[in-house]
A protein has these predicted regions:
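Structured C-terminal cap/extension of enzyme domains
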Residues: 6-107
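Short acidic active-site motifs
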Residues: 2-3
Length: 107
């Protein structure tokens, strides 16, 4: 699987990111550094990518937008209500999301 870091490092530009809804600063900093040709910036981008990967993964354990809504709830940004046919994330997924956003120091 090619990550956003690898895509940008190979000359790709831009991203579509669910994670940016809950980690806009990290995602913005990652994007800025990962599109640089400077080795120092690319090293910083790799560090940020390592921080963000568990969050990216957690946002797709269940159907979007339920995981990001739950993460936003943990961050006191909104509630985790979703409309049918969507459902809230399971208790198992809540644990995965919480661990991921804690590891990224978002809460």
């Amino acid at each position: 699987m090619i990550t956003q870091f690898e895509f940008n490092k190979r000359g790709g530009v831009g991203t579509i990111s669910v994670t940016a809804n809950i980690a806009p600063k990290l995602c913005s900093e990652f994007q800025k550094n990962s599109t640089s040709k400077n080795d120092e910036n690319l090293a910083k981008a790799k560090e940020l990518d390592d921080i963000l990967q568990p969050v990216h993964t957690a946002m797709f354990v269940e159907s979007n937008p339920s995981p990001v809504k739950y993460a936003a709830k943990l961050m006191n940004l909104c509630d985790d209500e979703v409309r049918l046919p969507l459902v809230k994330v399971t208790e198992e997924t809540k644990i995965i999301i919480k661990k991921a956003i804690e590891s990224a120091k978002l809460i």
